[in-house]
């Protein structure tokens, strides 16, 4: 999923605003420390690198314009390597060791499923661009915010196109092995069935990111 300049600026602004809700006040001339969990390497880096470009641009423009209330923004970056375990380790270091005011990321739902509960326990504000519906919950995760559509919203648009525009009545749904892939299949299949489509094949976790070969599934 790509990110526009406007989205990046909005996300950075929202993250910084959220940081004032939970963390203690610090000196007015100190930079605002923003923890950042992009996937710069690994299978999700094709998305992570694009989001990183937008995020870096947003910070540069905010700082060049005088910062936030006169304070510069400092990104403290930890590459998740597209790995939920490394994402959790990075989040723990940022919220405890680095004492950041807010965390932006991870950029992958599978990683966020592991990170969101951890940051909620430390009352660290978080903004992420991940789609799995359960990744924002006002009761469980009151300091977690999303700057992207949910699986329900994406699924509604995609399924409408498949059933109403393409007029397909038999549909196969497959996913990768990530938490995002499993959650997506579990969300989209009932939505397709509700629109009258027959799901002839449901394949949860049939391939890993970066290794998909469509031939066997197409033949089946």
Residues covered by each model-derived region:
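Extracytoplasmic "Venus flytrap"
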Residues: 35-54, 78-84, 107-108, 174-183
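Envelope-exposed proteins and targeting segments
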Residues: 30-33, 71, 143
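Signal peptide-proximal N-terminal region
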Residues: 53-75, 196-197
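Short, well-structured alpha-helical segments in soluble
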Residues: 84-99, 161, 213-220
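N-terminal secretory signal peptides and thylakoid transit peptides that target proteins
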Residues: 1-16, 20
């Amino acid at each position: 999923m790509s990110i526009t300049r406007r989205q990046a600026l909005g996300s950075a602004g929202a993250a910084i605003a959220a940081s004032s809700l939970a963390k203690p006040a610090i000196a007015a001339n100190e930079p605002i420390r923003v923890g950042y969990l992009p996937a710069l390497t690994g299978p999700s880096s094709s998305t992570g690198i694009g989001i990183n470009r937008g995020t870096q641009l947003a910070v540069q423009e905010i700082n060049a314009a005088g910062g936030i209330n006169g304070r510069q923004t400092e990104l403290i970056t930890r590459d998740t390597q597209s790995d939920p375990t490394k994402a959790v380790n990075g989040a723990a270091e940022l919220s405890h060791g680095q004492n950041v005011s807010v965390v932006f990321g991870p950029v992958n739902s599978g990683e966020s499923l592991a990170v969101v509960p951890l940051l909620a326990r430390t009352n660290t504000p978080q903004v992420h661009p991940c789609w799995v519906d359960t990744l924002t919950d006002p009761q469980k995760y009151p300091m977690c915010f999303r700057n992207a559509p949910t699986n329900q919203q994406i699924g509604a648009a995609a399924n409408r196109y498949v059933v109403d525009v393409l007029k397909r009545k038999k549909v196969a749904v497959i996913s990768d092995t990530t938490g995002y892939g499993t959650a997506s299949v579990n969300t989209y299949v009932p939505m397709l069935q509700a629109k009258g489509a027959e799901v002839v094949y449901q394949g949860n976790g049939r391939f890993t990111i970066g290794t998909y070969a469509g031939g066997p599934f197409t033949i089946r």
